[in-house]
């Protein structure tokens, strides 16, 4: 088994990485198993170069992490805690953050997807709907009447 693999981003840029790094992605791991020994670049059609490099940076840092079991995944998802390195890694602009989340989902890198989603959850935590709209530049398309109706229907969920 070769120690290196070449990935080709959606913008046709080839990036060579350690196989162990690339195999943090279940999609790439399965592709490599299906392709066998090949010198051809592995196409990653839904991820551009800058996002792929960010994902590879994360995978490189976490390449020696053990693959988690389903139960460990559940426990990890129940908390919004993020380790310090991952917090720093996720300090990117919103567009890049969402691109990383989409790439992690597409590439089937569950731990990275969790970190991205926890980052967004922490951005939302404790904010009012107005503050959330402002944070994510979301237009409010509800009429005041619709807002009142939604508040009444969800009164049970309000903090008291």
Curated annotation (Swiss-Prot):
Pathway(s) per entry: Protein modification; protein ubiquitination
Location of the region described as Interaction with the F-box domain of F-box proteins in the Swiss-Prot/TrEMBL record: 101-160
Species of provenance: Talaromyces stipitatus (strain ATCC 10500 / CBS 375.48 / QM 6759 / NRRL 1006)
Quaternary structure annotation from Swiss-Prot or TrEMBL: Component of the SCF (SKP1-CUL1-F-box protein) E3 ubiquitin ligase complexes.
Keyword Cell membrane on entry: no
Protein name (Swiss-Prot/TrEMBL): E3 ubiquitin ligase complex SCF subunit sconC
SMART domains in the record: Skp1 (SM00512)
Keywords (A to Z) from UniProt: Ubl conjugation pathway
Keyword flag Ribosomal protein: no
Species lineage: Eukaryota, Fungi, Dikarya, Ascomycota, Pezizomycotina
Cellular component per GO, a single term: kinetochore
Coiled-coil segments on the chain, per record: none
Biological role stated in the UniProt entry: Essential component of the SCF (SKP1-CUL1-F-box protein) E3 ubiquitin ligase complexes, which mediate the ubiquitination and subsequent proteasomal degradation of target proteins. Controls sulfur metabolite repression, probably by mediating the inactivation or degradation of the metR transcription factor.
InterPro entries referenced in this protein's UniProt entry, alphabetically: SKP1, SKP1-like, SKP1-like_dim_sf, SKP1/BTB/POZ_sf, Skp1_comp_dimer, Skp1_comp_POZ
Listed GO MF terms: DNA replication origin binding; ubiquitin protein ligase activity
GO terms under biological process: exit from mitosis; G1/S transition of mitotic cell cycle; G2/M transition of mitotic cell cycle; kinetochore assembly; mitotic nuclear membrane biogenesis; negative regulation of cytoplasmic translation; negative regulation of mitotic metaphase/anaphase transition; positive regulation of D-glucose transmembrane transport
Similarity section: Belongs to the SKP1 family.
């Amino acid at each position: 088994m070769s120690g290196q693999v070449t990935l080709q981003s959606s913008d046709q840029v080839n990036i060579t990485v350690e196989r162990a790094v690339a195999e943090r992605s279940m999609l790439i791991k399965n592709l490599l198993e299906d392709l066998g020994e090949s010198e051809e670049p592995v196409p990653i059609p839904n991820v551009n170069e800058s996002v792929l490099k960010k994902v590879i940076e994360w995978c490189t840092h976490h390449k020696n992490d053990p693959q988690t079991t389903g139960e460990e995944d559940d426990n990890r998802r129940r908390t919004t805690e993020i380790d310090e390195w991952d917090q720093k890694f996720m300090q990117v602009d919103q567009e890049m953050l969402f691109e990383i989340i989409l790439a992690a989902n597409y590439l089937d890198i569950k731990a990275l997807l969790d970190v991205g989603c926890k980052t967004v959850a922490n951005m939302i935590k404790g904010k009012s709907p107005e503050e959330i709209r402002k944070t994510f530049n979301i237009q409010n398309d509800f009429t005041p009447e619709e807002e009142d109706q939604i508040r009444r229907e969800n009164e049970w969920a309000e903090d008291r």
